[in-house]
Amino acid sequence: PQHVHQGRVMVKLLEDMDFPVFVLSDDIAEAKVQTQVATQKAREINGPVALVVKKDTFGKFTAPKIDADLPMSREEAIMAAAEVLEDNAAVICTTGMPSRELFEFRARNEAGHHRDFLTVGGMGHASSIALGLAMAQPERPVYCFDGDGAALMHMGSMAITGQSRAKNLTHLVFNNGVHGSVGGQPTVGFNIDMPQIASAFGYVTANRVTTKEDLQKAIISSRLTDGVTFIEVQVRPGNRADIGRPTSTPAEN
């Protein structure tokens, strides 16, 4: 729903900031002319211009597949994690597919959605929201279900979380090596040592898991940790084509 409003105000917003705006045509010949004119304009003003692309302007494209011989999909990992959470645990879930998968898991199990905050349209902000909740409710276990792309997008928040020493917060990053919610473009998630980064930020424990058993053990062990816990869950890229969207609003939760 946030994209409807963003799309409605996009051109005016750019014009108000004095950007030359070109709405890209879906006619290839006209689009080529527009890009040439836009490029020339950028050179003339020695500054940026905006090419606004409407929905369905481009055809479908399959991104190169990332090879990952891992036992779990992200959805399977989210289900495995949710199975062992305390009854009073709060879950702050990152935007996109992870929130949709968690919502469907709760619906299938008739578990209700009252413990979950789905960070729809707020990529990269889930961990900050989770930290705020953990500080406000120190007696309540709080879990952040994050993605590799989202965590990398606002990694500065991990430094703040690591230095917070919040004893009731566990930060899980479901790392599938791609931006899975917006086309499958690769991240650098599989090329870096996320637990080592988390340790440098001050997380008390930081582990990497790939199996359901190790994931659930790590979550249960996190309850005994005297500080913030980080768990990287390496999973296969991809998601179900028929995954639904949340049918309730945050206010209804």
Language-model-derived ranges and their functions:
Residues 1-2, 60-66, 102-106, 155-156, ...:
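Short acidic, glycine/serine/threonine-rich loops at helix termini
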Residues 2-37, 185-221:
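Conserved thiamine diphosphate
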Residues 15-21, 31, 44-55, 230-232:
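Internal alpha/beta core interface subdomains
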Residues 24-25, 50-54, 92-94, 145-146, ...:
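Short beta-strand segments
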Residues 48-87, 224-253:
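Glycine/aspartate-rich loop-and-adjacent alpha/beta segment that forms the canonical ThDP
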Residues 62-123:
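Active-site diphosphate/adenylate-binding microenvironment
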Residues 100-177:
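Thiamine diphosphate
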